[in-house]
């Protein structure tokens, strides 16, 4: 079954192998030896190439910033925009996050009865979990 997936590549690979055979039959080295080394550029050409690369990079960044400003800071590449493609889903997710944050905050003892509440809770714990040696549970 895997052969049918690669069947379009079969004629292409045959063509490539045929071309390689023709290239090996022709004198190949003499043509390359006459060319200068392509990796060595004159200093002026390398400076021009570097300047062109920097210019293109700056233009690309300017276009990206302009596009981001047009979309209001929420480009399609940002994770928030991908998650919030549907407005109701985005609002529901935001409310769920806020509700989760509200419930995970530690409770603080603020108010009129706060100091006494701790003492009452401590007495209840002592009474419920005190020593039960020789006494029944109903004695309390």
Swiss-Prot record:
It holds the Pfam family Calc_CGRP_IAPP. Its main location: secreted. Belongs to the calcitonin family. One of its GO terms (cellular component) is extracellular space. Coiled coil: none annotated. It is found in: Secreted. The gene is CALCA. Disulfide bonds join 84-90. Residues 1-25 form the signal peptide. It comes from the Eukaryota. This is Calcitonin. Keywords: Amidation, Cleavage on pair of basic residues, Disulfide bond, Hormone, Secreted, Signal. One of its GO terms (biological process) is regulation of cytosolic calcium ion concentration. One of its GO terms (molecular function) is calcitonin receptor binding. The modification Proline amide is found at residue 115. Calcitonin is a peptide hormone that causes a rapid but short-lived drop in the level of calcium and phosphate in blood by promoting the incorporation of those ions in the bones. Calcitonin function is mediated by the calcitonin receptor/CALCR and the CALCR-RAMP2 (AMYR2) receptor complex. Residues 26-81, 120-140 form a propeptide. The keyword Electron transport does not apply. The keyword Disulfide bond applies. Transmembrane segments: none annotated.
């Amino acid at each position: 079954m895997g052969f049918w997936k690669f069947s379009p590549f079969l004629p292409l690979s045959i063509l490539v192998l045929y071309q390689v055979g023709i290239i090996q039959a022709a004198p190949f080295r003499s043509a390359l030896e006459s060319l200068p080394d392509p990796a060595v550029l004159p200093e002026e050409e390398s400076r021009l190439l570097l300047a062109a690369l920097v210019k293109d990079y700056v233009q690309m960044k300017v276009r990206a910033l302009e596009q981001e400003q047009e979309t209001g800071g929420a480009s399609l590449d940002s994770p928030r925009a991908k998650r919030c493609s549907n407005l109701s889903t985005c609002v529901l997710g935001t409310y769920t996050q806020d509700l989760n944050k509200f419930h995970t905050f530690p409770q603080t003892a603020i108010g009129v009865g706060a100091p006494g509440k701790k003492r009452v809770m401590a007495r209840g714990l002592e009474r419920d979990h005190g020593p039960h040696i020789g006494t029944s549970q109903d004695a309390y």
